[in-house]
């Protein structure tokens, strides 16, 4: 029964890793790579995180509903697929290529796409799950988010910086690397999970 929920559970985990990785390490990235003072980081990145994150969370359901009205099959997964593609491209560009004067633009766009599907994960899992199993699936989702988000998110950036690149100034490479890993993996999971998700919606509605 749970095979239809697995793509959302696992795919969302990789997006959550990016979310907490960015939130934990962007201030350090701006300080080490671009030489920003902590007060500037707090003022400017704080505003970017607030507005980009809020805009992404609000926009996700709006876009999903619009795609549904256009009869797009499994619109929720389509939003997730677009998110994965965008993050795979925009993330590395932001952390490797942008100058100090334009990096916040890249971080804004990245933060927007990271938060775009967040509101859809939990509600979509509920939509395709029979009533008697919703509590179990919700528990699995919360467990997955906590383990991957709070655990792996901040840790994986530190691992690449300290153990792989072995240079604290390589945090830009570490940030780009997690996007190049998590982005394509989440894309593949969502892409191949779209059909089972669509079938689950049909079964639930019938």
Predicted regions and their residues:
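C-terminal transmembrane helical hairpin of 12-TM major facilitator-type secondary transporters
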Residues: 73-121
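Extracytoplasmic gate region of multi-pass secondary transporters
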Residues: 4-57, 114-122, 149-157
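Helical-face signature of the major facilitator-like transporter fold
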Residues: 12, 16, 107-111, 142, ...
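Multi-pass alpha-helical transporter architecture, strongest
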Residues: 88-97, 175-206
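A late C-terminal transmembrane helix in Major Facilitator Superfamily
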Residues: 53-57, 130-165
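Helix-to-loop junctions at the C-terminal end of transmembrane segments
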Residues: 56-72, 161-162
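A membrane-interface helix-boundary motif in multi-pass transporters
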Residues: 37, 73-78, 159-183
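Conserved glycine-rich helix-kink/hinge and helix-boundary motifs of the Major Facilitator Superfamily
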Residues: 9, 42-43, 135-140, 176
